[in-house]
Amino acid sequence: MVTSLKGRDFLTLADYSREELLFVLETAKHLKQRYLAGERVIPLLPGRHLAMIFEKSSTRTRISFETAMRELGGDALYLGWKELQLGRGETIEDTARVVSRYVDGIMARVYEHEKLEKLAQYSRVPVINGLSDLLHPAQALTDIYTIMEKKGSDLSKLKIVFIGDGGDNVLHSLMLGIGILGGKIIISSPKGYDPDPRIIKLFEEKAVPNGGEYEIIRDPYEAVRDADVVYTDVWVSMGQEAEKEKRIKDLEPYRVTVELMKHAKSDAVFMHCLPAHRGQEVVDEVIDGKWSIVWDQAENRKHVQKAILALIIP
């Protein structure tokens, strides 16, 4: 039985057990129900402050974390990378030491995952991964919450398929989360776009003992046959602009189209963490069509992040 997660960092889902992830998901469900019932502020973190450090820009991450803190009775401070002394040469170590003297938690959205690990190492308060080049755990846990909300809580009974870049940071976190919870994820990507070996190693250590599985199927039509969930993400992330032409060419056969979705179950759902590059990884008819739950998925970011914040910030 989980009693407390206070003071824990939230850098990767691999740091959490099956029971702990379910505890966060159940807390998110409870908080969302109270919000929808009219409780716009649930003061679980009164007087607490969250520093939000952004090396990479964002719409959803900033708004969802900021509103989440305020709805928990706390406050959030936006700190752009260039606005901090980080942009003028101060080390991450010193930044972590100083910022953590002023606030109760730090959320950081960075390019290299190692920066998050260094922040956490030198911070006196919990550090939350708002996105890195390797992982996006808050997004993935939101996705799992949304899948359970729409399709039921037993992931082992669902066929969940990710189409596109197998090295995607959201996919990496989805693999770990779904696997730790005992589910299976199918990845359909071209050769050369497989998951990072570090994630495969973590999956084998943390997910396989819980019954987690993953499978790579190169043919997207074969992969989505009878799928319950079809998920995709952008082909060119921030920092990959130099590879844009090659990536688009390589991944073009993995575009999610109406024809592809017809091979999934009739009640299948389509997911995307957003922002979407319409016409690249997905066509308008899918993201705006009957399969799409992307807007519910985006809304759930706030509720899941409220649970994370409420549970780990002392």
UniProtKB/Swiss-Prot annotation:
Keyword Ribonucleoprotein among UniProt keywords: no
Major site of localization recorded for this protein: cytoplasm
Taxonomy, superkingdom: Archaea
Localisation: Cytoplasm
Associated pathway: Amino-acid degradation; L-arginine degradation via ADI pathway; carbamoyl phosphate from L-arginine: step 2/2
GO biological process: arginine biosynthetic process via ornithine; arginine catabolic process to ornithine; citrulline biosynthetic process
SS bonds (residue pairs): none
EC number: 2.1.3.3
Chain sites annotated for binding carbamoyl phosphate: 58-61, 85, 109, 136-139, 273-274, 301
InterPro entries reported in the protein's UniProt record: Asp/Orn_carbamoyltranf_P-bd, Asp/Orn_carbamoylTrfase, Asp/Orn_carbamoylTrfase_sf, Asp_carbamoyltransf_Asp/Orn-bd, Orn/put_carbamltrans, OTCase_ArgI
Role played: Reversibly catalyzes the transfer of the carbamoyl group from carbamoyl phosphate (CP) to the N(epsilon) atom of ornithine (ORN) to produce L-citrulline.
NCBIfam families assigned: orni_carb_tr, PRK00779.1
Protein name per its UniProtKB record: Ornithine carbamoyltransferase
Organism: Staphylothermus marinus (strain ATCC 43588 / DSM 3639 / JCM 9404 / F1)
Gene that specifies this protein: arcB
